[in-house]
Amino acid sequence: MSRTPKLTLNLQFPAAKAWPEHKALLPRAAVAGWIKAALFADGELTVRFVDAEEGRTLNRTYRGKDYSTNVLTFAYAESEDDPVTGDLILCCPVVEKEAAEQGKPLVAHYAHLLVHGTLHAQGYDHEVEEEAEEMEAIETEILGKLGFPDPYQ
């Protein structure tokens, strides 16, 4: 029987004043549970919920893309033997807009993006179709176990 990975979580919500309803949907225990469900090894992660300006600045600085995106993952582990370490940055207004456009509950979209970002922190990617299909299948399975619907339907 495999053990549950340990998670050290630093939760930051500088966008709380502008997005209090988002913070209310994201209690520490829920965020930690969603991340732990997607962790395959011990992890030390910072999750930061930001506004559009900070999201855009980070995306422009680190990816060369001048717009806010839903989730950015910065993975720091240097080898597979290291604990999973990284920062997940979620942009509240982008997540809210996408959830509305996709007709899904905001909390379900946050859970999906936290699982998605956690997989990125472990080296999963979706740049080529085969990798995207694998990553989407893992996300769908994890979210199903957490009681959320398939995010790709």
From Swiss-Prot:
Example of a GO MF term: RNA endonuclease activity
GO cellular component: cytoplasm
Segments crossing the lipid bilayer: none
The protein's Enzyme Commission number: 3.1.-.-
Signal peptide: none
Domain of life: Bacteria
Family: Belongs to the endoribonuclease YbeY family.
UniProt cross-references to NCBIfam families, sorted A to Z: rRNA maturation RNase YbeY
Gene behind this protein: ybeY
Keywords associated with the record: Cytoplasm, Endonuclease, Hydrolase, Metal-binding, Nuclease, Ribosome biogenesis, rRNA processing, Zinc
Role played: Single strand-specific metallo-endoribonuclease involved in late-stage 70S ribosome quality control and in maturation of the 3' terminus of the 16S rRNA.
UniProt main location, coarse: cytoplasm
Protein name in UniProt: Endoribonuclease YbeY
Cofactor note text: Binds 1 zinc ion.
Disulfide bridge partners, by residue number: none
Broad EC category: hydrolase
Lineage of the species this protein comes from: Bacteria, Pseudomonadati, Pseudomonadota, Betaproteobacteria, Burkholderiales
Known cofactor(s): Zn(2+)
Subcellular location: Cytoplasm
One record GO biological process: rRNA processing
Keyword Zinc: yes
Pfam families hit by this protein: YbeY
Coiled coil: none
